[in-house]
Amino acid sequence: MNAASSHEPQGRDARPAGPGSSMDGGNSIRAVALGASTGAVEALLRLLPGLPANYPLPLLIVVHLPVDAESTLATLLASRCRIAVKEAEDKEPIRPGVAYLAPANYHLLVEPDFHLSLSSDEPVLFSRPSIDVLFESAADAYGSGLAGIVLT
């Protein structure tokens, strides 16, 4: 991320409108970034199935799992949730009401145009995917419209 460039879209209509968004300049939450350690999978299995089918915000999720573990978490959550749950794909547009999980061994980032990006850059603080990488990029894109949750 280049410090010289602004990651904040310019102008009143620069951000997509929709559920959870505010076109009047308010600080409405428009996305939720969620980070979890391996031990917090049980909490995710309780939290996400409790969301209603019409949950209006995108959920951007990083779970620290062992590098050699094949992740079936997205499939497991999808079978238990009323919202859509999927592994994030590179360059995928972020949609309301969808939970995106970082694929195993990839950093998950939010681009300024509200698309997802996957990176195989070096681990950050021994982790890939890294909660820090997701939170920093999502905060750059959403600003005060981002809520962050860390489960331990």
Where are the regions that the model predicts?
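Conserved acid/base catalytic micro-environments in cytosolic active-site loops
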Residues: 1-152
